[in-house]
Amino acid sequence: MFSPKIIILSTGSELTSGRSQDTNSSWIANELFGIGFTVSKLVVLPDDPEAILEELRTLVSLATKKNPVLLIMTGGLGPTEDDYTLEVVCKLKGVSSVESVVARQRIEAFYKLRGKNFQESLQTAIRQISVPKDSTILNNEVGIAPGFIVSLGENAHLGCMPGVPGEMTEMFREEFSTWILKKYSTRELHSGFRFIWWMSESQFQKEFISKEESVTSEKVIWGVAAKRGYIRVSFQSNERALVDFLLKKLDEIYGPKSTLDVFEELPKLLIEKKITVGTAESCTGGLISKIFTDKPGSSTYFYGGVISYDNGVKEGILGVKKNTLKEFGAVSMETAKEMAEGALVALGVDYSISVTGIAGPGGGTPQKKVGLVYFGIGQKNEKTETHEHYFPFPRSSFREFAAHTGIYLLYNRLKRLA
């Protein structure tokens, strides 16, 4: 089987009008890269059935035996009148739709749980539990509407998933990626990655890629993606030893700044060590707490957070001294330290993260510029760590840089103590 030409299509007039951003395509492309596939093209289409149908026909016409095509489409599987995916695919295939038994059971349970009559809402619900005849069903373990995969001739396939990110990501990881590997993978491909903290793509290119000959050999596929506060470096090769060599190189050169996925690894550490954590946030406005609580099961280790935007909250709830605020200011190493220590007491946790900074665009001074931020990492009965960073970026980016850095700093402390 030849490797397919993969094209990702995102549908939704909210995307083509600019009201929403297409995050699904980049996520899928990154997941595909991790299992050995690259994307040829990204397409965004409005909720226009004729436009969608025309685009699909054009893309399917590109498929040949030596160049098969895999189309991955998200969106348009909901209950509303502008959800056209099922209708378009059935028309493209020349087939009728049929109910998914599993999806029907899920939606009946959904209605029963909420005390609603399924039969009264059947016409609306039926759109969400139907798939094209003779399709491979992708079960939806998070929402209602199933996804599906259809054959469009001998050399083309189309996979459709919901546009809701939480539903799509679960469906892709649990079912669609497995189907792709079984269908198209012809060789074992090894991969690995690292996060490199506070590093730009260009800096990494200069420091590592240009100097490491094995990276630029034909045996390695590498990629770098810039995130808020870090870059994600990935390698793929048929040779496991080569991937391991490059990852070890990164760890040797960048030390503790080279990590696994901190946002996945930190919760594991907290659960494994039975550690509780809380936050004291000023400039990030609760974003660190959001990162924690985005993870299912976070209540086992995350107790809560204090958004101490006002100095009165810093004093009244966190116990920051009035003299500290007067002498050093709200944005200072000293205040970050007392915020972290106050959070330990106020929340009754083992560890705490505090952050205070100047998000801008105003509020800066020659001594304390916009982008300056201080962190405290508190530990019960131990000395509090403090850190200073400078992120001279727009307000929303600054907040993400700061929140991600706070998560990293706690992770780093726990790893050092392990």
UniProtKB/Swiss-Prot annotation:
The protein, known as: CinA-like protein
NCBIfam families from the UniProt entry: PncC_domain
Family label: Belongs to the CinA family.
Pfam families attached to this UniProt entry: CinA, MoCF_biosynth
Superkingdom assignment: Bacteria
Annotated InterPro entries: CinA, CinA-like_C, CinA_C, Competence-induced_CinA, MoaB/Mog-like_dom_sf, MoaB/Mog_dom
